[in-house]
Structures are given as structure tokens and as C-alpha cells.
């Protein structure tokens, strides 16, 4: 993640848990939001603007959290 700059952090509460959302800017003027569940489990949402990246991420975060709570047996397998 060279040349990206952290521009904002906020905490989103969902079902009694707090999740950190970090928003970064890129040199080309675009942005992305990131939440790390673990070092190997990260979701990223891209956007042309700060607001677009953050809104997309906030919309997707509940789905990402819920999908991680699904039993492995009910998940699709390749």
C-alpha cells in the first residue's frame, strides 16, 4: 500500500460489536475504505470520492459480517 494516505477512521457498531473502518486516499485521487477482521480477512470498498468509498463500505459491512457468521456447511464450495 505504497503512497496511500489514511484520511479518516470511524467505528461502526453492528450487532453489539464495533468494527473499525479506515478510509485511504490514493495518489490518483480515488479512495478506498477498509475493515480488517484479521490479518488475512479484509474487505475493501473502492470509490472515486471519499463519500462514495465510505457509503459503499458501510452498505457492505453488515453483509460481510453476517456472511462470516454462517456455518461452513452452508457456504458454497468450489
Regions found by a protein language model. Give the residues of each.
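Generic alpha-helical secondary structure signal
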Residues: 12, 23, 35-36, 54, ...
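Short N-terminal "domain-start" leader segments
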Residues: 1-27
Amino acid at each position: 500500500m505504497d503512497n496511500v494516505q489514511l484520511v479518516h477512521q470511524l467505528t461502526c457498531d453492528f450487532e453489539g460489536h464495533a468494527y473499525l473502518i479506515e478510509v485511504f486516499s490514493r495518489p490518483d485521487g480515488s479512495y478506498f475504505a477498509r475493515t480488517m477482521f484479521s490479518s488475512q480477512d479484509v474487505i475493501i470498498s473502492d470509490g472515486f470520492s471519499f463519500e462514495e468509498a465510505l457509503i459503499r463500505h458501510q452498505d457492505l459491512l453488515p453483509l460481510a459480517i453476517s456472511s462470516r457468521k454462517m456455518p461452513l456447511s452452508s457456504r458454497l464450495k468450489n
